[in-house]
């Protein structure tokens, strides 16, 4: 990224995890007969650019990286329309918004084409990928060609959870509202699959961001690392440099984080790998703003303000 382009990323905070509910996305859901409430367990939140800008001002956010909402859409035509609308929004507010492109995964050829178009023609800063797309998880070797294309361009890759295909939805609360349990579960499943299948070793130039304070990865790191080693010794899986792969990951703070989550995350990730995120509008403005004082005080007390709010994000965007 050029010095001129990087100027727009200076400021009090960079929000690395936020969404826009665009008309093209809502139209795509209707055309594809996808019921967001049925799939996610809650309706799409209301969104407008005016409300988002007001939220940013209230929260002290100078620049936001937008991505498509959930449910994930794998339709190639819809992905193009959504990316074009994101690009238009960012052209209207170039010092406020950037975006990461939607890819029609698991369509590999279509995703490579859309990645190139979105980054070369529309100005996308990278891509958003679902933890699984129609049951094909990140780390699946069938997705290697798209990761090779992303790796070639040192691409930013922001992971977002998607519901697993088979869930215990009846009489089990965790299967009804995805954000409660299934989102962090599926993110964790996807990243462990990437580590097990050496995605980060094969494609070392990828800049991968794991959402929601790492989901369950801080808890799982030691267990998974030990299990991978044991399984390899039993010839049940190929040897994997688990620690080296894990160290490559970045983590955002989206999802109403608390000090306890920071403590756990810092046991497995270095401070320069943590970036600020809000998950707006899925986390409503009043919730983010209600936590703002506590969040700011905790970050300030630990001397992390510039690192987490600005410096780490700028380094990731400009690297």
Where are these regions (language model features)?
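A structural motif corresponding to the C-terminal end of an alpha-helix
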Residues: 56-62, 89-97, 194-206, 243-249, ...
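Hydrophobic faces of well-ordered beta-strands that scaffold small-molecule active sites
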Residues: 14-18, 64-66, 98-102, 127-129, ...
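Mid-to-C-terminal alpha-helical segments outside catalytic/metal-binding sites
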Residues: 1-16, 20-63, 84, 113-117, ...
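Aromatic-lined glycan-binding groove of carbohydrate-active enzymes
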Residues: 195-198, 202-244
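Active-site gating loops and adjacent loop-to-helix segments of metal-dependent hydrolytic enzymes
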Residues: 10, 19-46, 165-187, 224-248
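Active-site gating/metal-coordination segments in enzymes
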Residues: 62-197
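Catalytic metal-binding/acid-base residues of hydrolase active sites
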Residues: 19, 162-163, 214, 281
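Glycine-enriched alpha-helix->loop->beta-strand junction motifs that scaffold or abut catalytic
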Residues: 122-126, 151-156, 176-177, 203-206, ...
């Amino acid at each position: 990224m050029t010095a001129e382009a990087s100027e727009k990323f200076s400021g009090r905070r960079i929000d690395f995890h936020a969404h826009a509910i665009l008309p093209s996305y809502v139209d795509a859901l209707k055309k594809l007969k996808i019921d967001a409430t049925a799939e996610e367990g809650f309706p799409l939140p209301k969104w407008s650019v005016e409300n988002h800008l007001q939220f940013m001002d209230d929260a002290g956010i100078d620049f936001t990286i937008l991505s498509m909402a959930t449910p994930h859409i794998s339709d190639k035509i819809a992905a193009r329309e959504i990316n074009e609308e994101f690009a238009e929004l960012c052209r209207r507010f170039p010092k406020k918004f950037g975006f990461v492109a939607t890819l029609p995964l698991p369509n590999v050829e279509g995703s490579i084409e859309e990645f190139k178009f979105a980054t070369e023609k529309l100005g996308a800063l990278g891509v958003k990928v679902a933890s699984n797309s129609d049951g094909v998880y990140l780390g699946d070797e069938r997705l290697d060609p798209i990761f090779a294309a992303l790796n070639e361009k040192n691409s930013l890759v922001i992971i977002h959870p998607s519901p697993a295909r088979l869930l215990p939805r009846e009489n089990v609360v965790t299967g009804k509202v995805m954000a409660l349990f299934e989102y962090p579960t599926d993110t964790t499943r996807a990243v462990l699959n990437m580590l097990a299948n050496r995605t980060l070793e094969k494609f070392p130039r990828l800049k991968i961001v794991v959402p929601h304070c790492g989901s369950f990865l801080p808890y799982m790191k030691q267990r998974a690392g030990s299990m991978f080693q044991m399984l390899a010794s039993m010839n049940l899986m190929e040897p994997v440099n688990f620690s080296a792969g894990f160290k490559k990951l970045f983590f955002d703070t989206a999802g109403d984080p608390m000090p306890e989550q920071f403590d756990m995350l810092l046991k497995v990730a270095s401070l320069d790998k943590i970036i600020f995120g809000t998950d707006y509008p899925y986390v409503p403005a009043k919730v983010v703003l209600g936590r703002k004082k506590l969040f700011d005080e905790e970050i300030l007390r630990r001397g992390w303000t510039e690192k987490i709010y600005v410096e780490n994000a700028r380094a990731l965007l400009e690297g």
